[in-house]
Structures are given as C-alpha cells and as structure tokens.
C-alpha cells in the first residue's frame, strides 16, 4: 500500500481545504503537507477521504493522535443497536433513529459512521440535510468525531465521485447530483445519512432523485424527529401504516423518549 499522496490527490485535498490549513486556517503555500488523518502507521489508507491539507508546522504538532468523543448513554445505545442491525442481523440496510430536534442525532450518526469505517464496512459517507447551515454543522461534527473531512457539494460541483472524499449536500441538490451520487454508490461501499428524512417526500423531485441516486448504497441511516407525516405524503425508503406513522421493524429502529 502506497504511503505518499499523488499530485492529483494533493490537488483535491487543497481544493477541499479551500487553500487553507485544516487545523490553523492559515493560507497554504506550495510546501503544504498532504497528511493522513488516521496515521499510515496505524493502518490509515492513502486515499482522499483519509487525507487533509496542513501547513508543515501543524502537521508536525499533530503527531499521530486520533480524536475521541464521549457519547451520551442513548447515543451509545443507538450506535450499538444500529451496528447489530446492519452488520450482525443484516436483515435490512436501513436503520432509523427517531429523536427530537436538538437531542444529538448528528453526533449519534457520526459515531455510527466511524464504527462502520473502523470495521472496514464502508469507504464513503454521503450526508443529506435540509438546509445549508445544517450541512455546515454536519461537516464540523463529522470531522470532530471521525477525523475525516467532509466537503459540502452543490449542483455545480459535477463529478463528485472523482473527489474520493465524504460529502454533504442539501436535499434540494440531490436532483442535480443524481448521476454523481449514483456513481459513488456503485463504485464504493457507501453509507448514506438522511437528516430530517421527512423532507424527502416521494412525490417531490428530490425524493424521486434520492430514490434513484442511492439505490446502490450499502447502508442508509435515517434520522427523523417527525415520525408521522400530517400531509399524507409518503417518503422514500420507509413504509407508513394507516395512521401515517413510520412502519419499520423495532430491531431496526431506535426511538429516544422524553424519559431518556
């Protein structure tokens, strides 16, 4: 396995970083370092999703430390239940986390992604969120928990599959990136995380696009704080019962109650 990043990989890394060191934020010069997020000495691969652009000083100071985040009890339980459903039972590729807004679903989802990455089950992560500001928060939390940088992409970014990195986008961007997302899921083992899943109404343009774009995803993690749809619309990936409530197996669902 090669240790050094290629020139093409370095170009992608500095593009993702916006030309700035991804630790201190200073503008990078030509002598910037293409660094392994998970150290090469600890099994880290020389791929863009495990790379970051750093100034020489920050790379030296960084050493080989990997971040650890302490989970709340419910986040730990959700992660373990999800891993058991997806990897042990393998009854279905979808897992649902139902918890109120602000409860910490993003952290729980990122910890699940890290677990799947560490176990060698996935290569890429794609996050779909409702708004740009939420997308930005995902990028920050994802890095803090996994140590991997996640780039925001829009319809204008084109061939996302060539970036070889984890990405996040709004639901509305899905239709314009449908072919690229489809290619990513066909070429790599991909976890798709759907934040505020009720935004993906089946009849809406981004709902139809998502259904096609992610049909080959290895796993789909569905986050919702609205298990019932008052408008009667159906969403992708999940079925609903006669009361318009999500109808998904209990073993494939984690629900956070107010008592928790």
Predicted features along the sequence, with ranges:
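Inter-Walker segment of RecA-like/P-loop motor cores
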Residues: 143-179
